[in-house]
Curated annotation (Swiss-Prot):
Reaction equation(s) it catalyzes: uridine(54) in tRNA = pseudouridine(54) in tRNA; uridine(55) in tRNA = pseudouridine(55) in tRNA
Record gene name: pus10
BP-aspect Gene Ontology terms: tRNA pseudouridine synthesis
Protein name in the entry: tRNA pseudouridine synthase Pus10
Keywords for this protein: Isomerase, RNA-binding, tRNA processing
NCBIfam families: pseudo_Pus10arc (TIGR01213)
Function: Responsible for synthesis of pseudouridine from uracil-54 and uracil-55 in the psi GC loop of transfer RNAs.
Record's keyword annotation contains Cell membrane: no
Domain of life the protein comes from: Archaea
């Protein structure tokens, strides 16, 4: 036999029963526009024809080969074997690779997959496959027996065939660059589940009142504070998502307002069932949830890679604060000028504040105070300060000194106790770069 394709096919079929798809997959890179089922069917027919020719030309070994391989070749060999050697044909077992399940699993995966895509409002998807180890091992054994070098994996075939048939139903397309979901097909079990990618939105929030936390803070009696996350729950309801996560460019204290530029964030909705909601509608829902205490602006869709960029790029960016500071014994113009000269442009050495030591490691931070402008308030031992600082500088501790854990501090420079009694964030330097691609 002088055909490498037929030689490879015969080596495999002499040892293993193979369905048309699993045989044809050994030669998946030969020919164009054919399915593996068509390849396998064609190879089987030509192989039977070639062996039949050799028998007719007096090759007795060819008859033995044909009769021996016929159960593994299948129904296409029955009539020829029965004609050449009546009563010799024997039924073979199921396919050694897929167990005869491949066709039915592909068909059922398309049905269930399409239902899931529609249920989750998915237009762009990819297909993944979870393959039992025994199937992968059987496939490798057949490849070794055949010795063919033009095949593909059963995973690749399932991904392609399921994807192609789903696209043919309309309304969905395979998108490897930015899929909205992944359909996972189990083989040979046949189960299908969907991994829905989160919705991600660039947005900003403003906290217009104090005692509002950024994250939801549950207690047995209910939320400890109203939160930015809680205000966004109407967005979760609107999108039909399972959970909402706020990825903000830093955070302010619960008792601090966020004013001015607002704080940049990415809003993530996990496992949404409705994806194509206009930004204006999402923003309106969020602002309704904010109850006049928190305001939002939704800007554009975001990419997953930008979540990390928001956190990385904003960890030490500049921020501007307004602080109302009480000073023991009052404060004068001389005091505020002395503060400015001592602290403006200084690098502040700051150990983790004692108030957060229970949840953060005790480390030494070096953060710069870029500018400081304080004004005494008449009739009270108070001053109002506008500070521009490097991100990560704890302003309350910059004022109080935190028992010497922050140096220099307002209290150290003034030589008496100083306390920040109000704090507002009025500007956050931010334009996180777009993620690659």
């Amino acid at each position: 036999m002088d055909s490498r394709v037929l030689e490879s096919a015969l080596r495999a079929l002499s040892r293993y029963p193979l369905c048309d798809r699993c045989l044809g997959r050994l030669f998946a890179r030969l020919g164009r526009g054919w399915s593996n089922r068509e390849r396998g069917e064609a190879v089987k027919r030509v192989l039977v024809m070639e062996l039949h020719r050799r028998v007719l030309e007096g090759d007795e070994a060819a008859l033995k080969t044909l009769v021996s391989a016929a159960p593994n070749i299948g129904e296409v060999a029955r009539d020829v074997v029965e004609h050449l050697s009546p009563g010799s044909y024997r039924e073979g077992g199921p396919c050694a690779v897929c167990g005869g399940r491949l066709e039915s699993v592909i068909a059922s995966a398309v049905e269930e997959g399409y239902r899931l895509l529609r249920a989750y409002d998915i237009e762009r998807f990819v297909v993944g496959v979870r393959l039992e180890r025994g199937v992968a091992m059987a496939e490798e054994e057949v490849k070794l027996a055949a010795g063919a070098g033009y095949g593909e994996s059963i995973k690749a075939e399932i991904r392609r065939e399921v994807g192609k048939l789903l696209v043919s139903r309309g309304g969905v397309t395979v998108d490897f660059d930015s899929p909205e979901a992944t359909l996972m097909v189990e083989f040979p079990g046949g189960g299908v589940d969907i991994q829905v990618n989160s919705l991600l939105y660039k947005a900003r929030y403003w906290k217009l009142a104090r005692n509002i936390s950024q994250a939801y803070w549950p207690t047995p009696e209910g939320p400890r504070y109203f939160s930015v996350e809680q205000a966004l729950w109407p967005v979760l309801k609107l999108t039909g998502g399972e959970r909402l996560v706020v990825h903000a460019a830093g955070r302010e204290d619960v008792d601090a307002r966020m004013l001015g530029s607002g704080r940049p964030m990415i809003v993530e909705v996990k496992s949404p069932r409705r994806r194509r909601i206009p930004l204006e509608e999402l923003e309106a829902a969020a602002n309704a949830g904010g109850k006049g205490l928190v305001r939002f602006r939704f800007e554009t869709a975001a990419k997953r890679a930008e979540v990390a960029l928001y956190k990385e790029e904003t960890a030490r960016v500049r921020k501007v604060y307004r602080a109302l500071v009480a000073v023991e014994g009052g404060v004068s113009e001389v005091d505020v000028e002395g503060l400015r000269r001592a602290l403006e442009g200084a690098v502040i050495m700051q150990r983790t504040p004692s108030r957060v030591l229970h949840r953060r490691p005790d480390i030494l931070r070096r953060r710069r105070l870029y500018s400081l402008d304080c004004s005494p308030l008449e009739g009270a031992p108070l001053m109002e300060c506008i500070l521009e600082a490097e991100g990560g500088l704890y302003i309350k501790e910059l004022v109080s000194g935190d028992g010497g854990r922050t140096r220099p501090s307002f209290a150290e420079v003034l030589g008496r106790e100083a306390v920040c009694i109000e704090l507002d964030v009025v500007w956050v330097e931010h334009e996180a770069p777009a993620a690659p691609g």
